[in-house]
């Protein structure tokens, strides 16, 4: 098996799965991090199969961990180029699992944290077929050169005390999405730093359960 296709996953409570949830971790972590959220949300999403891929690259600022792209240079145009270079590998991971489960983009939910949000939002905006929905925790939006998808609803969740990725990035993302008339919501959580808490998970669950398939 391709090394990129080896990752932790959790089957849906009900079979066959009707939705695929793709969890995208932050820089320096790996897929085992966000898969740890599944026990807290699985029962509220009984038809969802969860996968948590590892970042495409080894983390280049520490001897352990993974990354979706390097953050050595944080210039937006450099980051956009790095994401564009790696995005096809993430798409391959998702497409293979979709084929295994007989699902498509319209059945797929993207959930990212921090750097995972950055690549998850980018991935969402370049799709020809929209995802079911996308959720971004504590991240930022790096615009692609071309936006193909304006139909996937997006939920942004951010701690007001975040010192890693400031909450201003949520507002920047919201402004960008508003200009494109993309349906989205933003949630600033009080007393929360760069993390995911129970409030954020509840918002995410409610968002998923109120979304409808884009025709």
From Swiss-Prot:
InterPro entries tied to this protein: AB_hydrolase_fold, LYPA1-2/EST-like, PLipase/COase/thioEstase
Keywords (A to Z) from UniProt: Hydrolase
Gene3D superfamilies: alpha/beta hydrolase
SUPFAM superfamilies: alpha/beta-Hydrolases
Domain of life: Bacteria
Nucleus listed as a keyword: no
Record-listed E.C. numbers: 3.1.-.-
Any one GO MF annotation of this record: hydrolase activity
Record Pfam families: Abhydrolase_2 (PF02230)
Protein's UniProt keywords contain Transferase: no
Active site: 114, 162, 194
Enzyme class: hydrolase
Family affiliation: Belongs to the AB hydrolase superfamily. AB hydrolase 2 family.
UniProt protein name: Uncharacterized hydrolase RF_1189
Annotated source species: Rickettsia felis (strain ATCC VR-1525 / URRWXCal2) (Rickettsia azadi)
């Amino acid at each position: 098996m391709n090394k990129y296709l080896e990752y932790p996953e959790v089957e849906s409570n009900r079979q066959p799965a009707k939705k695929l949830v793709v969890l995208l971790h932050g820089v320096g972590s790996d897929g085992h991090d966000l898969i740890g959220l599944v026990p807290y949300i699985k029962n509220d999403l009984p038809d969802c199969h969860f996968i948590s891929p590892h970042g495409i690259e080894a983390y280049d600022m520490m001897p352990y961990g993974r990354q979706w792209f390097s953050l050595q240079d944080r210039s937006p145009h450099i980051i956009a180029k790095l994401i564009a270079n790696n995005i096809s590998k993430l798409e391959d991971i998702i497409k293979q699992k979709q084929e295994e489960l007989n699902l498509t983009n319209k059945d797929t939910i993207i959930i990212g944290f921090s750097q995972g949000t950055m690549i998850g939002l980018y991935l969402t905006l370049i799709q020809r077929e929209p995802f079911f929905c996308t959720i971004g925790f504590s991240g930022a939006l790096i615009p692609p050169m071309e936006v193909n998808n304006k139909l996937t609803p997006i939920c942004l969740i951010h701690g007001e005390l975040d010192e890693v990725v400031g909450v201003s990035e949520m507002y920047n993302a919201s402004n960008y999405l508003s200009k494109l008339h993309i349906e989205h919501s933003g949630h600033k959580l009080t007393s929360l730093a760069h993390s995911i808490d129970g409030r954020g998970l509840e918002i995410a669950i409610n968002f998923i359960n109120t979304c409808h398939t884009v025709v």
